[in-house]
Amino acid sequence: MNYDVIIVGGRCAGATTAALLAREGVRTLVLEAAPRHADMPLSTHFMQPPGMDVLDDIGVGEKVRGVTPPTRRARYRMEDQDVHGPYPEGRPAYCVRRATLDPLLQDAAEEAGADVRFRHRVVELLGDGERVEGVVVEGPHGRERIRARLVVGADGRASTVARLTGVEEYLVRHPQRAGYWFYFPTPGLWHDDPRYADFDGAIAWEGDGLRYLFQCDGDVLLMAAAPPKEEARAWGRDYRRRTLEYLGRSDLFAPLLAETAPLGQGRGYLGAPSFYRRAVGPGFALVGDAGHCKDFVTGHGMSDAFLGARRLTKAVLQDTPLAYERYWRERDATTVPYHFDAVHQGRTDLNDAFTRLIFESMKESEGLSRRHGLVLDRRRHPRNLLTAREMLGIVARGVLRGRLLPVAGMVKNAVAWRGYRRQERVYQDLLRDVGARAVPAARSDATPALSTPR
């Protein structure tokens, strides 16, 4: 049987895209290399409010809410400054383990009418040299050739579809931090101790260190360490003990660690580049980490995958070359600000005098904290947390109190932010160019018509 769309990869991006397409009557096949209900070794876990909106579209949102406690208010620590940042009213975030989430997404795809096959690994792409026309897949019963009008790579940062099509990468950035995390049975302290009473999750910058604490489904806590790569490289196979020691150096984490022990061996890696890849080509498209992968420190990757699935579905249903190009350019224009924000927040020297002064101001201003919630909800640009006038005023007040070091930090950040803005405008201009060409157009051989939705 041939399909309208073959999706390679059946997790966040792939299963969500399949559910959205199948609900519109598009004949959709999902090929997932792993067994059903296999865990995902590396994942940020965190779903920001816009990502939850997409899960509501496919009927998974309430299932996630039913098993996962919400993160309505987070604590952000910069040395001795604690800022409490609320999410917008009624729009919390959720930290759900992939062993829980992925089956919900895969079930949603199947219930919508998609054909989901597990233990099926794509080894080749079919085509005439000009466009992709299908895949060669290895499954439990051998090799099979399957054709489709569109092949979607939703198979992660090491995407087979991206590799076989040879798409170019751009905006490549190498992280300064590693990431290691464990799950812990939630100790009574988390619920009963007043030290943990006014927040649902925490991110702490102390020295050049970065630590995370969030509540997950199944009454477990996720605690994560993001040390500089140079430090983590020395941990080697002793990462379990070293991660726990690293977490325990913070007085926010130490009391919890004294009352609980990690489940399993934990996960982690020394960091991998963030990047963009060309999102479309003749007969194929990329979605999720296959097309764009950012630094994990800001926890936007899963939401990007869900939003990308919604955007790609729109392009598939419109089914014109311009629609696919718009999908690509919208992805870039809407995510590049958060890409650079992740690069910025992943710096090992972020904890400087300037940033600490900003934290002090956020602590004194509930309005600034609420603005941060709007950034996480993607209703405010990440670098519009403060206006230029507000930033100058904060630094000026610090200077009047004899604090001169923040001036150098402000200048350094201003130079970096100007560079980010300049590059953001490039991708905004490319999107505007697509909009200027948005006139009725006949279908092109670049992407043949899909079947009429049922």
What are the language-model segments listed below?
Residues 1-13:
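Beta1/beta-strand and adjacent pyrophosphate-binding region of the FAD-binding site
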Residues 41-75:
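N-terminal FAD cofactor-binding segment of flavoenzymes
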Residues 314-454:
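C-terminal helical "tail/cap" subdomain of flavin- and related membrane-associated enzymes
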Residues 142-144, 154-253:
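Conserved FAD-binding catalytic core of PHBH/FMO-like flavoproteins
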Residues 67, 231-325:
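FAD/FMN-dependent oxidoreductases across multiple families
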Residues 53, 70, 75-164, 171-177, ...:
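Conserved N-terminal helical subregion
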Residues 6-8, 22-43:
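Glycine-rich FAD pyrophosphate-binding loop
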Residues 13, 36, 158:
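Conserved Rossmann-like nucleotide-cofactor binding loop
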